[in-house]
């Protein structure tokens, strides 16, 4: 059985292709390429879905973080805390602003940023902001982080690149008073046909500032900006896909539940069951006994036709461009070294799950 890590074929089925071709044809006929009605429609509906007041579309998820830092006035000489495990974009945005990243350790049960480590780093390094990551689609402990950061005036930007449809105890990711950044890269649960991103914000003032910066700083309040627009075709694709996202996320939760059930008694460790109904399950990670076991298992699954990937194979501090920064990340290093992600999509079948889990349980 051949099982791909991403299932684009079922996602972009014939019905969807027909509908999206009609929309793109409409955009071509109207000569509305840079921005248009679908940008505004998507911003309105995505904000509503995530419980936010405003959604500002931008060019990509990395820009979403960097512009958020800029809006908060964070730049040269400022220190920003990030979890030891995340995608390159989180730390790149900080470095692009001329700020200094400080590593914060993770909870070894789930890979999420640790509030206790956050408290230590806030006090030791005079952080101006932290960027907790809703990694894999899991909800980061935002309320606990706010209890640490708010009294000290430390800003929080939620990196929600993998969390379209994720729920905190208080509501959807994006419904807090923090800025929340999203990526719509083609592999995400809600994905464009190229690059696109967004920032969810609580106020119209922040919304307008983000949109101005992303449009070369042009507007009534002119400022230094950049080219970070989401083009009309990408916005149209996102608007169309938004119709199915809740249905598809529900299916992902069912897939994750079946994985949990079928992996009972195996040698891999699954994430806590408390996340089964709150995560968007962008990824389905398991923990192996060691990096060597992970490599062996990945090779075995590959031989049997199953595509896997080690998101993320290393902590940031172990990657050449990001070595030498201060902080703590020993648990992050251990977690990254043992993590393997199994295929998950809205279309993963029970038969595929059982096939994968039987291979895992055979070792």
Predicted regions and their residues:
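PLP-dependent aminotransferase class I/II
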Residues: 14, 39-44, 49-53, 116, ...
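Active-site phosphate-binding strand-loop segment of PLP-dependent enzymes
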Residues: 109-192
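Conserved PLP-binding active-site segment in aminotransferase class I/II-type PLP enzymes
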Residues: 1-67, 71, 75, 337, ...
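Hydrophobic/aromatic ligand-binding patch that stacks against planar heteroaromatic rings
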Residues: 92-94, 148, 189, 233
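Active-site PLP attachment segment
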Residues: 175-209, 232-235
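Conserved PLP-anchoring active-site segment centered on the Schiff-base-forming lysine
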Residues: 66-125, 129-131
